[in-house]
């Protein structure tokens, strides 16, 4: 019985480590983190009502799409890194979703704000 439980535990650990996850980034490291990648980036403010509605759907989509999506918290507008990144990408309202390819803005996502719509869009990028 212990051997079976041990085996199940190992399988669980394997599944846990192999699952797809998004990656984390920050305003200061975004440019380096997405270098040579095409990703959908969410710029959000924790105090924004629309951001609070979107974030759970974003998180579900990010679990499926892994490193093709990243959310950047830009709540602290007094932070120099936040100022730099929001100026660079002309972020004036929240939430804003941009497709960035090799650090350059290629388009703004204007579609539905649901897990399925986000996943479908990212798969088509």
Which ranges hold each PLM region?
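Single-pass alpha-helical membrane anchors
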Residues: 1-22, 58
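Thiol-based oxidoreductase modules, predominantly thioredoxin-like and allied folds used
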Residues: 43, 62, 66-83, 112
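Ser/Thr/Pro/Gly-rich low-complexity linker/stalk segments immediately outside membranes or between
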Residues: 20-34
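Beta-strand cores of modular interaction/reader domains in eukaryotic scaffold and signaling proteins
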Residues: 39-42, 70-73, 96-100, 108
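Non-catalytic, surface beta->alpha helical segment in thiol-disulfide oxidoreductase systems
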Residues: 93, 98-125
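Extracytoplasmic/secreted envelope proteins and their assembly/folding machinery
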Residues: 31, 55-62, 82-86, 115, ...
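Local sequence-structure signature of Cys/Sec-based thiol-disulfide redox active-site neighborhoods
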Residues: 30-68
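A short glycine-leucine-enriched loop at secondary-structure breakpoints
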Residues: 87-92
């Amino acid at each position: 019985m212990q051997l079976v439980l041990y085996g199940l535990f190992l399988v669980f650990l394997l599944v846990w480590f192999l699952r797809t996850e998004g990656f984390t980034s920050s305003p200061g490291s975004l440019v380096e983190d997405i270098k040579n990648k095409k990703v959908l980036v969410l710029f959000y403010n924790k105090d924004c009502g629309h951001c609070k509605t979107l974030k759970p759907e974003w998180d579900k989509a990010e679990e499926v799409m892994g490193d093709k999506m990243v959310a950047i918290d830009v709540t602290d507008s007094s932070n120099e890194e936040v100022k730099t990144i929001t100026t660079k990408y002309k972020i004036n309202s929240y939430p804003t979703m941009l497709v960035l390819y090799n650090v350059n803005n290629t388009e703004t996502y204007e579609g539905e704000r649901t897990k399925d719509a986000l996943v479908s869009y990212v798969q088509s990028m």
